[in-house]
Every structure is written in structure tokens, then in C-alpha cells.
Amino acid sequence: MIQSFTRLNVADNTGAKEIMCIKVLGGSKRRYATVGDVIVASVKKALPTGKIKKGQVVKAVVVRTHKEVQRENGSLIRFDDNAAVILDAKREPVGTRIFGPVAREVRYSGFMKIVSLAPEVL
């Protein structure tokens, strides 16, 4: 469950290491984001040689949350961290590699490129 001011790790090779959620997209009063949701975020930590710089405002899709997500079959899935993948204007990933596992809910949200780049889909 991601809300404003939540800090997330970046699970791709764009050069950004940590982002902070500014807004959850999808409705004027929407408060929380979960796996597969798109957020607007500010880059808080970044590598100096990366594509994304510190202070830049980006869109990202949440791929892992520490708060468990209930699936339709009743099972729960939870990760050790909150993580996101940075997107461009066409909602395609900016990076060329994804690090760590990705939840299956990302596939249902229509981010097939992220699912194909991920080393593991849980």
C-alpha cells in the first residue's frame, strides 16, 4: 500500500535508486496504490551517470509492496520491500533491465514489457 511521501526502491537500471511518491494516479481522491498501479514520484537518490537525475519528476508502476496483496484464489503475496519501475510518456519502461521478482498483477495491468524483462514473476 503506497501513499504520498512513501519511499520506494527502483527496480530497474535507469540510474535512480530511490523515489518518493507524490501522487497516486487514477481518481481525484485516490489515496493508496498497490501492485500494478501508476504513481507520480520524485527521484530522491540517483547515480550521477544514470539516465534519470535526482530531483526529476517521473511516472512509475509499483511492482512490489511490503503490504500483502490478496489474489482471486484467496492466496496472499508479500515482498520484502516497496519497489517500482520508471516509465516514459508512452508507459513503457525507461530501463532495459528489471531487478528482483515482479508480482503477477503487473501483467494484468497491461505492462507486458516489464513482465518480459523481469527475471521472475510471482
Curated annotation (Swiss-Prot):
Family annotation (InterPro entries): Ribosomal_uL14, Ribosomal_uL14_bac-type, Ribosomal_uL14_CS, Ribosomal_uL14_sf
SUPFAM superfamilies, per database record: Ribosomal protein L14 (SSF50193)
A single MF term (Gene Ontology): structural constituent of ribosome
Protein name per UniProt: Large ribosomal subunit protein uL14
GO biological process per UniProt: translation
Protein family: Belongs to the universal ribosomal protein uL14 family.
Domain of life, source organism: Bacteria
Coiled coil: none
Subunit annotation: Part of the 50S ribosomal subunit. Forms a cluster with proteins L3 and L19. In the 70S ribosome, L14 and L19 interact and together make contacts with the 16S rRNA in bridges B5 and B8.
Function: Binds to 23S rRNA. Forms part of two intersubunit bridges in the 70S ribosome.
UniProt key word Ribosomal protein: yes
